[in-house]
Amino acid sequence: PMTISVIIYEKQFGSRNETPQHLKYEVSDFENLEQTPAYFKSNHDQLLAGYVYTNPEVVHPNGVIIVAHGLGAGHNTYLPEIYYMTQNGYTVFAYDGTGNDESEGKSIVGLPQAVIDLDYAINYVKDDEQFDGLPIMLYGHSMGGYAVIAVLNHHLDITAVVERSGFY
């Protein structure tokens, strides 16, 4: 039984994940959506591709929402949700986790890595002065849903969480 578990785990998490083209969106698909690159490092010094999304018409955002993507897709799959958030007055910080799309890493490693990457993303947002004074919220889907719940043990100051189809 253990051998079967290892085989399944390696098949799921043992390689890089590139989002299929039919699941990707582009910023140009949305009006009033601006994207600014914001790269940061995670636990093994791997560079993660992060992006700040804003609506240029919003002068004083309600807060910053950090988006943690699910298994099988990078952050750009969530651009419709990100667009909705920005059009309702929020700044969004989204990123590709280790081994996903534009981020470094030979594989996505596993569920614990999703939590680790989110922890580093939260710390990046907390340390970046453009987010000073803004409440921090989390939005996670699937594997990202797992991460947004699990990371709360380390960040008691998170204002709100949306966990969509997560598993724990």
Where are these regions (language model features)?
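Alpha/beta-hydrolase active-site loop
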Residues: 108-129
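Alpha/beta-hydrolase
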Residues: 68, 95-97, 164
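Short beta-strand-to-loop junctions in surface cap/lid or active-site-entrance loops
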Residues: 50-60
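Primarily recognizes the serine-hydrolase "nucleophile elbow" in alpha/beta-hydrolase
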Residues: 124-128, 134-168
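The serine-hydrolase catalytic nucleophile loop
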Residues: 71-84
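Conserved alpha/beta-hydrolase
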Residues: 82-104
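Short beta-strand element of the alpha/beta-hydrolase
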Residues: 61-70
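An N-terminal hydrophobic leader/cap segment in hydrolases
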Residues: 1-41, 51
